[in-house]
Swiss-Prot record:
Family per record: Belongs to the TEN1 family.
Principal subcellular localization: nucleus
Pfam families for this protein: Ten1_2 (PF15490)
Species whose genome carries this gene: Mus musculus
Subcellular location: Nucleus; Chromosome, Telomere
Keywords: Chromosome, DNA-binding, Nucleus, Telomere
Name of this protein: CST complex subunit TEN1
Function: Component of the CST complex proposed to act as a specialized replication factor promoting DNA replication under conditions of replication stress or natural replication barriers such as the telomere duplex. The CST complex binds single-stranded DNA with high affinity in a sequence-independent manner, while isolated subunits bind DNA with low affinity by themselves. Initially the CST complex has been proposed to protect telomeres from DNA degradation. However, the CST complex has been shown to be involved in several aspects of telomere replication.
Amino acid sequence: MLPKPGVYYFPWEVSDGHVPEGSTLRTFGRLYLYDMARSLMTLAAPQKPDQCQLLVCTNLVEPFEAHVNFLYMVLGDLERMEGGAFVVRARLLTCVEGMDLSLLEKAILEQRRHLQKRQQPIGDASTLQTPTPAPQSIPSDSLSLEPENRGQQVPLPQTLD
């Protein structure tokens, strides 16, 4: 059986305890600290690194080349460690340095809105936005697979000798 695909969560949602234990999640953060001996890395939220940090267990994805202050995306399961702290057990760890974080955040919010709309009852249309109009159809006589210059001489490209 395949593992669950993972729901996107912002790093501060995970560190604030808004994600239930055992959930499969996707999140991101800047590599703040990597302890190779314990197979643990600390990811910090890019906007507030001193306030929001996540522990990530890396024993399933090692060896990997760790770059401090680079942006990483992680797919894994949220577990509780001895002592009560939460850790994300990484199944997939990807360096995504250079990714547009504001665009990623917008995409996550848009995906959440879409999923919420899909979960609403069909009769409850009061909270749904009006759908966009369908695109205009193109007349079938304007569609042609033939080249426009049929029967005309096409000059060959010039070559330099």
